[in-house]
Amino acid sequence: MTDQQLDYQVTVEELSALMKRTAGVHVDPVTLRQQADDGFDTFGLDSLGLLGIVAELEKRYGLGLPEQAERCKTPADFLALVNGALKTGV
């Protein structure tokens, strides 16, 4: 992993694209941003879909994300946890 990757932040737009690509759930990024504190289930994403997103990010960055990432209930919580892990390399 490079220093550039450590500074990288997963955006709402990227999360929206990952939801579509890995779980087949289409959510407009604007809606996702406006409702970031709503549960993933509100958008039709279940725990297996979230697991797919976690796996994709781990593969992309070569970094094991914290186990809590798979249990995040909202997009806001997920992005905060993932971006914190990317920043610290944990």
UniProtKB/Swiss-Prot annotation:
Domain Carrier positions: 9-90
Swiss-Prot/TrEMBL keywords: Phosphopantetheine, Phosphoprotein
Superkingdom classification of source: Bacteria
InterPro entries according to UniProt: ACP-like_sf (IPR036736), PP-bd_ACP (IPR009081), Ppantetheine_attach_site (IPR006162)
Pfam families per the UniProt record, alphabetical: PP-binding
Modified residues (O-(pantetheine 4'-phosphoryl)serine): S47
PTM description: 4'-phosphopantetheine is transferred from CoA to a specific serine of the apo-ACP-like protein.
Phosphoprotein among keywords: yes
Protein purpose: Involved in developmentally regulated synthesis of a compound biosynthetically related to polyketide antibiotics which is essential for spore color in Streptomyces coelicolor.
Protein name: Probable acyl carrier protein
Source organism: Streptomyces coelicolor (strain ATCC BAA-471 / A3(2) / M145)
